[in-house]
Regions:
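Flexible gly/pro/ser-rich segments immediately N-terminal to CXXCH heme-c attachment motifs
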Residues: 22, 33, 70-73, 94-101
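A general alpha-helical scaffold signature found inside nucleotide-binding enzyme cores
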Residues: 55, 73-77
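C-terminal capping alpha-helices of c-type cytochrome domains
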Residues: 2-13, 76-115
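Electrostatic cytochrome c docking/interface patches
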Residues: 2-32
Length: 115
């Protein structure tokens, strides 16, 4: 069934076959170096370095919503969220990481590969 296939996929690690120099690869580097790993995990890429208090992002691109189901998963909402999470969801634990526009663009491209 579709559900069984979904369960099998959700148990797999993220695809790590990114082309070095691609925007998605650049986004993975942002993920690894901007502080995301303090709270988030992506299976097969990097385990959480701090407390596992944030959502697992392994299959983020398959989700219809994010931010506690408050926002539709699209590039417009992700751009706003990554620029200033508290503006979209006051009281969120997600910090403003002061990412540049390029870093946000790359991170969104990377998150889009996580299926």
């Amino acid at each position: 069934s579709d559900f069984d296939a979904w369960v099998v996929n959700e148990q797999k690690n993220a695809d790590t076959g990114l082309t070095e120099g691609s925007l998605a690869y650049e986004g993975q580097q942002v993920y690894l170096n901007a502080g995301c790993t303090q709270c988030h995990v992506i299976g097969g890429v990097w385990d959480v370095q701090g407390e596992r208090i944030a959502p697992n992002l392994t299959h983020f691109a398959n989700r219809n919503v994010f931010a506690g189901a408050a926002l539709k998963n699209n590039s417009e909402n992700l751009t706003k969220w990554l620029a200033n999470p508290a503006e979209l969801k006051p009281g969120t634990f997600m910090p403003n990481l002061e990412l540049t526009e390029r870093e946000i663009e790359a991170l969104i491209e990377y998150l889009g590969t996580l299926k």
